[in-house]
Amino acid sequence: MPKGGIIGLLTTLAVTAQFASGQLEPDCNPLKADCQPKKALPNENYYIDFTKQTSPPQDWIIANDEAVNFTSNGAEFAYAKEGDAPSMWTGFYMLGGRYDIEMKIAPGQGVISSAALWSDTQDEIDYEFSGNQFGQTPFPPQDGMWAIETNVFAQGKMWDGAATYQKDSYKPAEQFHKYSVEWDEDHMNWYVDDKVVRSIQAKDTPSGFTFPQSPMKLQLGVWGGGDPSNSYWTKQWAGGEIDLTGAPYTMYVKSVSITNKYPACQYRYNDKWAK
């Protein structure tokens, strides 16, 4: 991961909870334009317990026109009607470290729960879960047959995706589990309940792609892959069309814990090094 020409250590800016328009998208892509510096996480460790929140935390941003509720169950992301896509993301970026998310996925055919690291240059490292196992049968699957989808994007291009299967008793829509991503300039690891389920080394990056190497936010949310208005293939991937009579379908996040490998105050792109 390039160190020079990417990080500018400036002053930390206060960011309050706010509502932004749409899904998480860059307001400025530094590969295409000169962009303002972005807030970084200045501390080595960060932890938030959503079960103790009663309103949006000041360092998280909630998508405009969507609702995320905070109760004793944690942050609640409810798919209640066609087009719902409640999500929120950190108001700060990181350039490497470990992210631990304690969550319970939303049930429901075609309902997608996600936890993703996402950058302004459209690098992405994610988890995606289908409430009905992406349409696989029989459902619910036997122990050892639950699949979790993990994906990697580099500058908006998907270069790796795979399903990992849980070997133990695993009921993700009924139980809370800890899902973790560890990422730096050398590797990416995905964990479930502190067990490595997948690993990628930077040296194995395929030709024509770059290893994710830009500061990222953490985004959490649920959306309707099986929305009736979606394309046939999107609905097929998600596990089929959503039964709206069974809504709402809710994903819960109890807590987020972060270990920050490179504490900083702000990130600045001094050139378009990633092009």
For every predicted segment, state its role:
Residues 1-26:
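Fungal secretory targeting signals
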Residues 19-180, 186-189, 195-275:
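GH16 jelly-roll
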